[in-house]
From Swiss-Prot:
<dbReference type="GO" id="GO:0034626">
    <property type="term" value="P:fatty acid elongation, polyunsaturated fatty acid"/>
</dbReference>
<feature type="transmembrane region" description="Helical">
    <location>
        <begin position="172"/>
        <end position="192"/>
    </location>
</feature>
<dbReference type="GO" id="GO:0030148">
    <property type="term" value="P:sphingolipid biosynthetic process"/>
</dbReference>
<feature type="active site" description="Nucleophile">
    <location>
        <position position="148"/>
    </location>
</feature>
<keyword id="KW-0808">Transferase</keyword>
<keyword id="KW-0443">Lipid metabolism</keyword>
<feature type="transmembrane region" description="Helical">
    <location>
        <begin position="241"/>
        <end position="261"/>
    </location>
</feature>
<comment type="similarity">
    <text>Belongs to the ELO family.</text>
</comment>
<keyword id="KW-0812">Transmembrane</keyword>
<feature type="transmembrane region" description="Helical">
    <location>
        <begin position="115"/>
        <end position="135"/>
    </location>
</feature>
<dbReference type="GO" id="GO:0034625">
    <property type="term" value="P:fatty acid elongation, monounsaturated fatty acid"/>
</dbReference>
<keyword id="KW-0276">Fatty acid metabolism</keyword>
<dbReference type="GO" id="GO:0019367">
    <property type="term" value="P:fatty acid elongation, saturated fatty acid"/>
</dbReference>
<protein>
    <recommendedName>
        <fullName>Very long chain fatty acid elongase 4</fullName>
        <ecNumber>2.3.1.199</ecNumber>
    </recommendedName>
</protein>
<feature type="short sequence motif" description="HxxHH motif">
    <location>
        <begin position="145"/>
        <end position="149"/>
    </location>
</feature>
<feature type="transmembrane region" description="Helical">
    <location>
        <begin position="64"/>
        <end position="84"/>
    </location>
</feature>
<dbReference type="InterPro" id="IPR030457">
    <property type="entry name" value="ELO_CS"/>
</dbReference>
Amino acid sequence: MDFVLNTIQWLREVPHNFKGEFATVVFDDSADILVYCCVLYILLVFMVPEHIMKNREPFNLRLPFVFWNIGLCLFSFCGAYSCVKNMIALYWERGFYRTTCFFDSSVAYDGEFAFWVFYFILSKIPEMIDTVFLVFQKKPVIFLHWYHHLTVAIFCWHAGHALIPSGLWFATMNYCVHSIMYFYYFMCACGMRKFIRPIAPFITMMQLLQMVAGTLIVLYTAYHSYLGESGCEVDRTSIRLGLVMYGSYFFLFAVLFGKLYLKKQVKPSGTASAYAMSKKRNGEKMA
C-alpha cells in the first residue's frame, strides 16, 4: 500500500518539477527524429496497405484498440485538467493579448503547465498509431485522417521549437477535445457503439469549433504581428503555417460534417461512405 501511495505522490510531483531546458534540448537537437517518423508514417499509409496487407486477412486488434483509446483518453483528460486550470489563471492575470502574444517563461517554461504542453507536442508522434490500427485491420484511411496526423505533428514540433505563446491555447483546446473523442472510441471498441453513437455529431462539431477557434487565434496574432502597435512574439513563420493548417482543417472537417450528418443519403458514395461505415462499425478515428 505504501508503494502505491508513494508512486501516486511521485506522479503528482513530476509535472511540478519539470524543467524547460529538457524540452529545449529535445526540440533543438532531435528534429531529425520527427523526419524519420513522418517518413515511416507516409510509408505506412501508402505502402503497407498495397504491399503488405493486400493479400492478408485483417488483424483482430480489438483488445489493443480498447487499451490504446482508454490510455489516450486518460492522458488527454489529465492534460486538459491541468491546462485549463493554468490557462484560466494565466488569462485572469495577463489578459488575452499578453497570454496569446507574449511568452511567460515563469509559467510556460518550467513546472506543471510546461510539462503537459511538452508531452502534448510529443504525443503527436505516438498518436500516429491510430493509423496503424486502421491499416492492419484493413480499414480505409481517408485524406483527412492522415493529413491531420502528419501536419499536426510537424506544426507542433515547430511550435515547441519556436516557443509560440499562442500554442498554449492550441494545446488546451486539443486536450479537451481529445479527452472526449478518445472516450467515445473506447466505448465503441468495447461494443457500446449503439449507446454512445448519438454523441458522434457533437464530437465532430467540437472538432470543427476547435478549428474555428484556432483560426481566429492565428488571425489575432497575425494582426498584432503585422499591424498592431505593440507587436506579437509569435514568429511569422508560425503564423503562416498556422493559417494554412487551421484553415485547411476547418474546410476538411466542415466537409466531413456535412457528408456525415447534414446530407440525408441512403448510401453515401466514395471514400466518405467507406469512412462513415468504418466509423459506425468500429468506432474508428475521425481524425
